[in-house]
């Protein structure tokens, strides 16, 4: 399917809201276009609706283009906007591995979308045939959390690419815990998988859960539609400022995550049953 066939018709047809900050990108000594109070400084101006500075920093760290990044109020907004963009209420369905992160099913219920869980194998690996057996003509999204919450295992990138290539809808790989995995990220594979969305977050390795900032990486056409669907100023200025400070510590975050992985492996070694 093409992206135009996957997106809800009303979303494709809508005229997106344009705010004052979208309509003028230059510099000015005075701003009168949004009825902001100019007598008090600090928090009186609307924030950048596209969070350009934060995205530029993320693009450099993850090796993608700014046009491939969407920022949401936590990953939960990224999850919800996926439903609102692609799934027709009362008509379409989604398929997800089970057990997994609970917000996929919660957002499905909120958006009146049928949720089809597919049990993992006993070793928590993906049952690909069962996964695709649950898919029908109205299946719009596959949800795969990797590393999976709550089982903790990450799935081989080759398997995830195979699934995303085979499925004709939108495949979402939720990488909230990717910084604690040795397998790596699906982000570098976005160029050859135009229907793939990769979600990440500031809440785990970045130790910034209070910011409520989630990330979706995808083809620029998907990101463009997300930007049309989202609320105009979804990421406030305080979050944007704090995110830039957090991103300054990228090297330290990588070091701490590596240390945690090393300690995790050591704990597993000492708590594993001894061979008999």
Segment roles from a protein language model:
Residues 195-269:
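PLP-dependent aminotransferase class I/II
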Residues 55-93, 111:
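Phosphate-binding glycine-rich loop
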Residues 1-61:
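N-terminal "arm"/small-domain region of PLP-dependent enzymes with the aminotransferase-like
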Residues 109, 126-137, 150-208:
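Active-site pre-lysine segment of PLP-dependent enzymes
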Residues 88-144:
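PLP-dependent aminotransferase-like
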Residues 35-37, 76, 101, 147-150, ...:
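Short glycine-rich anion-binding loops that position phosphate/pyrophosphate groups of nucleotides
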Residues 270-276:
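Conserved small/polar residues in nucleotide/adenosyl-binding loops
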């Amino acid at each position: 399917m093409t992206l135009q066939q996957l997106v809800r018709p009303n979303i494709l047809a809508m005229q997106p809201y344009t705010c004052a900050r979208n309509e003028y990108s230059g510099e000015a000594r005075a701003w009168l276009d949004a009825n902001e109070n100019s007598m008090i400084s600090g928090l009186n101006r609307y924030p950048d609706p596209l969070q350009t500075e934060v995205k530029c920093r993320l693009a450099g760290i993850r090796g993608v283009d700014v046009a491939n990044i969407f920022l949401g109020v936590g990953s939960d907004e990224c999850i919800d906007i996926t439903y609102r963009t692609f799934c027709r209420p009362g008509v379409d369905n989604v398929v997800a591995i089970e057990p997994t992160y609970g917000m996929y099913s919660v957002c499905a219920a909120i958006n009146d979308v049928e949720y089809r869980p597919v049990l993992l194998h006993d070793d928590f690996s993906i049952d690909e045939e069962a996964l695709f057996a649950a898919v029908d003509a109205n299946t719009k999204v596959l949800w795969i959390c990797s590393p999976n919450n709550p089982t903790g295992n990450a799935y081989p990138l080759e398997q995830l690419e195979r699934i995303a290539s085979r499925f004709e809808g939108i495949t979402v790989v939720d990488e909230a815990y990717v910084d604690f995995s040795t397998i790596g990220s699906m982000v570098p594979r976005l160029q050859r998988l135009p229907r793939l969305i990769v979600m990440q977050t500031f809440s785990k390795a970045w130790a910034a859960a209070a910011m409520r900032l989630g990330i979706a990486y995808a083809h620029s056409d998907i990101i463009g539609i997300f930007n049309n669907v989202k609320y105009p100023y979804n990421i406030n200025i305080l979050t944007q400022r704090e995110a830039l400070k957090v991103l300054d510590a990228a090297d330290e975050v990588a070091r701490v995550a590596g240390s945690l992985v090393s300690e995790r492996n050591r704990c597993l070694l000492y708590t594993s049953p001894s061979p008999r």
